[in-house]
Amino acid sequence: MIIVTGCNGFIGSNLVAKLNELGVKDIIGVDDLSKKDNLINIAHCELQELLDIKDFENGYLQENQTHEHITHIFHQGACSDTLEWDAEYMMKNNYSFSQRLLELAEKNSIAFIYASSA
């Protein structure tokens, strides 16, 4: 199982498309699904599941979840809005979420790949 955060963004959607091209379909896409205009980026891709970031945090990032089926985390999810003024949101979204993903990967020996256009 591969997790791709930021799957609706430029890098994430192209990554999912390339993985699909290589025959990989067991992908969980994670993004802020309240931004419906971004869903067009991922519409042509095949995902096993598409999750809102909040649902992902409340599910996969909980201590009581098993993670042995996850082999890779491609972390492309971040707020790239240079006009965003909400410091609390930026810290939660760009720092704390990344930290929790990295801790999950480290604890479970999951390959962690990070890229951002922000």
Segments predicted by a language model, with ranges:
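Residues at the starts of beta-strands that form the adenosine-phosphate
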Residues: 1, 25-27, 111
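N-terminal Rossmann NAD(P)H-binding glycine-rich loop of SDR-like oxidoreductase domains
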Residues: 2-24
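Glycine-rich phosphate-binding loop and adjoining beta1-alpha1-beta2 segment
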Residues: 29-56
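Active-site loop/turn elements of alpha/beta-hydrolase fold enzymes
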Residues: 32, 78, 117
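NAD(P)H-binding glycine-rich loop region in Rossmannoid oxidoreductase-like domains
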Residues: 44, 53, 59-93
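Conserved Rossmann-fold NAD(P)-dependent oxidoreductase catalytic core, especially the SDR/UDP-sugar
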Residues: 72-75, 100-118
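Conserved active-site region of classical short-chain dehydrogenase/reductase
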Residues: 95-99
